[in-house]
């Protein structure tokens, strides 16, 4: 067990700060984020050129260290050594929250394993920002990040998740969004979705409707900018009628194969299909 008192403990090691950056509008940069970036010894940036423009805008002279998915495992030991020596680091992504669809998570784990304090600053996050304005149920929700580019893997993913009652969120390229929606329609049926693009920018747009309606709209409209797709969860009532024809134990096993612990997998499937969790637990362990 580990207890971190972020601002009370007196340690010789430095602190790792996770600093969110604007997702499109520079006015969303917080006073605390600017102050932190000025005070730390180094900034670990996903793209030093992109972050350099941000630093210049806010008159921040702190030295940058390149840290991205292609050099993360090589750089992490050196960054941990800096933190152990007493230097403080800030990690930023190109836009939004660090660790969300970028390599920050591995650095955070390494810092925690080395008993180094990790402090996250609140700020811009595309998923939550879009979700609360989408009109779809904000809780429960689940964020999956970027989908596979391969149609077969994407369809298999949707088949596994089609029964989930949670609102689902994905990042997607404007060049692949029509193919993704087509695959989703085949697996999920014609659910309500919200397609969000250019979030916080001048041309911010929310497209709300069924999957088929959005697909029809996209046939006549070109898309630019990264997209965020928010999808309504499965309707519980319609799913309950199907439980007699569904092998719930197999679904539990799929969840476990995907990385879930057995008890969590049982809980997820029991909730999705509105069955007694203890009974499903017994079925699973009787095999």
UniProtKB/Swiss-Prot annotation:
Q: Does the keyword rRNA processing apply?
A: yes
The UniProt entry, under SUPFAM superfamilies, shows: Tetrapyrrole methylase
Question: Which Gene Ontology molecular-function terms are recorded?
Answer: rRNA (cytosine-2'-O-)-methyltransferase activity
What EC number(s) would the UniProt record show?
2.1.1.198
- Keyword field: Cytoplasm, Methyltransferase, rRNA processing, S-adenosyl-L-methionine, Transferase
Q: Which GO terms describe its cellular component?
A: cytoplasm
Q: Where in the cell is it found?
A: Cytoplasm
The chemistry this enzyme catalyses reads:
cytidine(1402) in 16S rRNA + S-adenosyl-L-methionine = 2'-O-methylcytidine(1402) in 16S rRNA + S-adenosyl-L-homocysteine + H(+)
Annotated family: Belongs to the methyltransferase superfamily. RsmI family.
**Cited function:** Catalyzes the 2'-O-methylation of the ribose of cytidine 1402 (C1402) in 16S rRNA.
What name does this protein carry? Answer: Ribosomal RNA small subunit methyltransferase I
